[in-house]
Amino acid sequence: FVGELQVRDVIYKTVMVRLPVLVPGGLCAPPKRIECPCLAVFRADAKHLKRCKGKGCVIYLHGNGTDIGGASEEAKTLARELDCHVLVPEYPGYGLAEGESNEDTVDAVTHACIRFAVELLRVPHDRLVLYGRSVGTGPAAAAAARMTLSSPLGPPAALVLHSPYTSIYEYAKEKAGGLLSYLLVSERWPTRKNLTQTGCPVLLIHGDRDEVIPFRHSAKLRKDAAKRSTSANTRKDNVKSKVNKAGDGKFRHDTRGASAGVVQLHVQKGASHNVFDFYGDVADPIASFLKRHECAPWHKGGEPWEAMDLDLRHLDARVAEFGPGDMEEYPFANMS
């Protein structure tokens, strides 16, 4: 699933990157460095291969029943339909990735991928779209909330949740019953709460015949959207104050105005959890949503961003030198 595809004057180059990540080392142990594969689809100028000219970047957090290989065709479709770059990080324990998959390690990989996009690839935070599918909707919503509340970056351009759950605990309660879920399942990825703390437009996509994660989960999330209007105004004031306090205005700015509080639900008519039209019921609704709700730069007449001048031939070496970053930046380091 790696290689190149040329469409007129654009080349979509798919490569595999070894993403350095810090994960918890266990009880009283220091964090451990691992490497997780990350599928990267870069949109390049056919005449100037070193120049990447996408409108932005999508970080795609895939579902439970697949890996980055299984998500590769969807990633390429998003790159073509949205005129953007796409990163698909692998979860520890999935595919060829080492380690164990749990909330802390998946959140750590998500953090490392966002850091890779923003700091190494130089993607502005307001050109970064977080897209989660099924189980990936939890870490995607959690990352958007962290970027809004505590990250020096600011909120992403948009958050897209495809077949989301309100929380892992509520999902387990439906499947196993209240007592059993209380005894065996802790509260993880509380998307319902995280959406009230997210300062960007949110698109929910759900099949009305989803037999794995029932449609009512998205309906509940959409119903709670009214709570975001007040929260969005508070976050907007907080972001402005942080810009003034920092004094440099770098990254921290709110470009979405009232759209920051938008939560829109797209219903996939007749679609189940795994059977749906990816073009018509995922890629196209995302493209329309980004244009409608002032998500830079999709609403600016399709102008490409400034070229990154990134030589992809040396990407592996640059990533290795870049490293996993400081432990204090990771979500697990800030758990109370």
Name what the model sees in each region:
Residues 1-30, 320, 327-336:
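An N-terminal hydrophobic leader/cap segment in hydrolases
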Residues 20, 28-116:
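Membrane-embedded segments
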Residues 91, 156, 160-170, 187-191, ...:
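Active-site nucleophile loop of the alpha/beta-hydrolase fold
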Residues 122-134:
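Alpha/beta-hydrolase fold nucleophile elbow
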Residues 132-142, 212:
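Glycine-rich nucleophile elbow surrounding the catalytic serine of serine-hydrolase chemistry
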Residues 197-199, 203-206, 210:
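Short beta-strand/loop motif that positions the catalytic acidic residue
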Residues 209-213, 273-275:
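Acidic catalytic loop of the alpha/beta-hydrolase fold
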Residues 220, 230-336:
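C-terminal catalytic histidine-bearing segment of alpha/beta-hydrolase fold enzymes
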